[in-house]
Amino acid sequence: MAGVNLQLRHAYSIAQFVPTVSSPPPLPTQRVRLGTSPSRVLLCNLRANSAAAPILRTTRRSVIVSASSVSSAVDSDSLVEDRDDVGRIPLLEVRDLRAVIAESRQEILKGVNLVVYEGEVHAVMGKNGSGKSTFSKVLVGHPDYEVTGGSIVFKGQNLLDMEPEDRSLAGLFMSFQSPVEIPGVSNMDFLNMAFNARKRKLGQPELDPIQFYSHLVSKLEVVNMKTDFLNRNVNEGFSGGERKRNEILQLAVLGAELAILDEIDSGLDVDALQDVAKAVNGLLTPKNSVLMITHYQRLLDYIKPTLIHIMENGRIIKTGDNSLAKLLEKEGYKAISG
């Protein structure tokens, strides 16, 4: 692992058999050359500014689910303590989280507090550089960042003690701002391997290709895609809307408990955004949650959040309902800046 860590820090892999990796692809590209066998390692190199996916060492793929809650606008310091959820066990609990860029030691997160319960939808908004995307990357264990303080508990487990792939298999999923292409690997093969990796983790029976196909057809309906989509290579030649729907399809197949959607609305026209939002809403249950990172109010018109959090200078400074986003849209960040 050490030999490929530097170049694969923005990567995920899924493999039935893991061959030796002698020379990882360069960072600037989003394409990766693979062998013709879908059971080979799938090394998907992401651009440096993409959201980090958990690094999956063998037959693993990231799983998603997100959430949190509160009712009216409050200061972030009282967020954890003031919630009226006595007796409820949080899905995700973040306390005083601090993190730096591993290489430069620049501090980005400066005491983030957030509590997410099952069945909630949370949105994190903020200016560029506020720390919101870094927060999502730290949650999934991106190696470019180092946690220097605080705690993250997911489903009662200390997330900071878990490797990125273990976080993924535990039920944490993260979507990409710019989903990568995987030439030579069909969606069907990709999803089947990811699904069975999750099943193995849960100690459940795996599905053969015929059984999996039957399972997958209903998931395609959720994301408004036809069955011939399964024969296409992962994200290759896809439109922006198709790539985002493919991300949601992965979420639907994997059944994660917490989904982190990092700017899933970026680059989408209104029709594509509505399709993606409809798919996300169709996956919400009382047992899973969603954490959305976004710049824009328009996403919140289609996916209604339980709570909205405003980040500034590495901290959540305000939490409230949808009226907070409308105030932001009308008056800008100056109206709520700490």
UniProtKB/Swiss-Prot annotation:
It is found in: Plastid, Chloroplast. Essential protein. Required during embryo development, especially at early stages. Involved in chloroplast differentiation. It comes from the Eukaryota. GO terms for molecular function: ATP binding; ATP hydrolysis activity; ATPase-coupled transmembrane transporter activity. ATP binds at residues 126-133. Residues 1-66 form a transit peptide. Belongs to the ABC transporter superfamily. ABCI family. InterPro entries: AAA+_ATPase (IPR003593), ABC_transporter-like_ATP-bd (IPR003439), ABC_transporter-like_CS (IPR017871), FeS-cluster_ATPase_SufC (IPR010230), P-loop_NTPase (IPR027417). The gene is ABCI6. Present in all organs, with higher levels in aerial parts. GO terms for biological process: embryo development ending in seed dormancy; thylakoid membrane organization. Residues 92-338 form the ABC transporter domain. Transmembrane segments: none annotated. GO terms for cellular component: chloroplast; chloroplast stroma; cytosol. Keywords: ATP-binding, Chloroplast, Nucleotide-binding, Plastid, Transit peptide, Transport. SMART domains: AAA (SM00382). The keyword Plastid applies. It comes from Arabidopsis thaliana. SUPFAM superfamilies: P-loop containing nucleoside triphosphate hydrolases. This is ABC transporter I family member 6, chloroplastic. Interacts with NAP6.
